[in-house]
């Protein structure tokens, strides 16, 4: 591959992602594999786990990746078609601490990509750009590595089933959206003692039923219809590569990740009083309040799973979660985001509570809030506007947080505007105790935004 064939736009903030056959080809992936192998060897790591999700391009791309890693002199262990968290698990289980998942996560079927962990660190930002620089400079190690195959699926299931215990049998609906979690999720929950109804658990990289992204309500319609037929304790939905979990209460309401986090935080803090819990800037104000109420220490941090993971590592916190649905349990687990494990922990805490799951969910704090709202810009344009907003913002009556965009917490609600790291959009989110407060906070943000750029077509 000449470097001219290396499209810079595939090197994203948290991973590598492109359109198969156009910006992401086997030849490109092979070069990236050699760069990852070179970087791993520079850090004294030469054994690398690789795995792939259920996309149609997976077998070709994982083979190219393995060739590239081997060309850098790495010993490659191919664990086959598995959820991304199983790749992370394998880096611990097999002691490699380095692994690459070939996955397009929740992107359309013609996309694929790489999530990369080297020496226990999930690559993001600069570290991902450095792989590109290595290839452009031809700063690549060569060697003759070997490629072997290993199956860690049973070890993964055993590890969870051996630790996460149900107090009573639960009846659950599981929707995998034809993503790669479809093989292991039903097995896991049956082994835990659940009665499982499967929706779209056949792995099919064309995603014929609905898109495997539980962050969007339209992708949860089928599961909601099934669960509200009655007799279910909960519904669980998984994203394309199994690192996020969506939750449906028996009455059909969506339990968004920041409200799920309240339950996980209480559970973890019941065993570790005073523990630290991390969440991202998009999460509800009630999460902060509930963590304090349960005797914990809340820490708000930047959105993005690699940022949250890094913060979790350096802080010694027990649990972290973000609004996108990535949840990281450090207590009893390894601190990586895993939708299947998150589902297992939810089932455990529901089964240990004397109340019916529907009551547990109903008792969670309720607020008036917006989903995530987006405003598109030309590439890079959103960063410039964000800088102007930060310079101009004045909210004397609010607690202002600027670790990731601008978040203003008022006595009765909050507003957030931040620049996305993955697409050229400004992201907004609003929450308040009532509709009047929500409108007031949105008005304040509206006037700030229009003072910076009067022609903005705001989504609120």
What spans do the regions from the language model cover?
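Phosphate-binding and adjacent anionic-ligand microenvironments
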Residues: 272-429, 434-460
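Proline/glycine-rich low-complexity loops and linkers
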Residues: 86, 129-158, 162, 251-323, ...
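Glycine-rich phosphate-binding loop
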Residues: 96-111, 227-249, 254, 298-338
């Amino acid at each position: 591959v000449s470097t001219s064939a290396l499209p810079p736009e595939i090197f994203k903030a948290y991973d590598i992602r492109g359109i198969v056959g156009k910006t992401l080809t086997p030849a490109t992936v092979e070069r990236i594999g050699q760069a990852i192998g070179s970087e791993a060897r520079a850090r004294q790591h030469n054994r690398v786990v690789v795995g792939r999700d259920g996309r149609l391009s997976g077998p070709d791309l994982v083979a190219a990746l393995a060739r590239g890693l081997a060309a850098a002199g790495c010993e490659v262990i191919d664990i086959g078609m598995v959820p991304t968290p199983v790749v992370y698990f394998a880096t611990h289980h097999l002691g490699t601490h380095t692994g690459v998942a070939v996955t397009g996560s929740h992107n359309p079927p013609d996309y694929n990509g790489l999530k990369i962990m080297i020496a226990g660190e999930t690559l993001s930002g600069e570290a991902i750009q450095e792989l590109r620089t290595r290839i452009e400079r031809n700063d690549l190690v060569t060697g003759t590595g070997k490629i072997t195959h290993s199956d860690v699926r049973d070890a993964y299931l055993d590890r969870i089933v051996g630790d996460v215990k149900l107090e009573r049998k639960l009846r659950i609906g599981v929707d995998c959206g034809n993503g790669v979690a479809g093989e292991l999720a039903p097995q896991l929950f049956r082994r835990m003692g659940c009665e499982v109804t499967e929706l779209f658990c056949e792995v099919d990289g064309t995603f014929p039923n609905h898109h495997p992204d539980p962050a969007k309500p339209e992708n949860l319609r089928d599961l909601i219809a099934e669960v509200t037929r009655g007799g279910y304790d909960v519904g669980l939905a998984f994203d394309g590569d199994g690192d996020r979990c969506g939750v449906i209460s028996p009455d059909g309401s969506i339990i968004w990740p920041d409200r799920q986090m309240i339950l996980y935080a209480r559970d973890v803090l019941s065993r570790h009083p005073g523990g630290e819990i991390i969440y991202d800037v998009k999460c509800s104000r009630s999460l902060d309040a509930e963590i304090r109420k349960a005797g914990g220490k809340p820490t708000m941090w930047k959105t993005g799973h690699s940022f949250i993971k890094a913060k979790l590592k350096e802080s010694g916190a027990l649990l972290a979660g973000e609004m996108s649905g990535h949840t990281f349990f450090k207590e009893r687990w390894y601190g990586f985001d895993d939708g299947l494990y998150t589902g297992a922990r939810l089932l455990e805490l529901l089964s240990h509570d004397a109340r019916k799951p529907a009551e547990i969910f109903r008792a969670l704090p309720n607020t008036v809030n917006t989903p995530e709202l987006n405003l598109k810009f030309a590439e890079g344009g959103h960063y410039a506007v964000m800088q102007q907003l930060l310079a101009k913002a004045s909210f004397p009556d609010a607690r202002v947080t600027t670790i990731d965009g601008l978040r203003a917490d008022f006595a009765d609600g909050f507003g957030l505007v931040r620049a996305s790291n993955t697409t050229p959009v400004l992201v907004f989110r609003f929450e308040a105790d009532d509709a009047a407060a929500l409108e007031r906070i949105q008005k304040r943000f509206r006037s700030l935004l229009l003072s910076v750029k009067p022609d903005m077509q705001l989504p609120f």
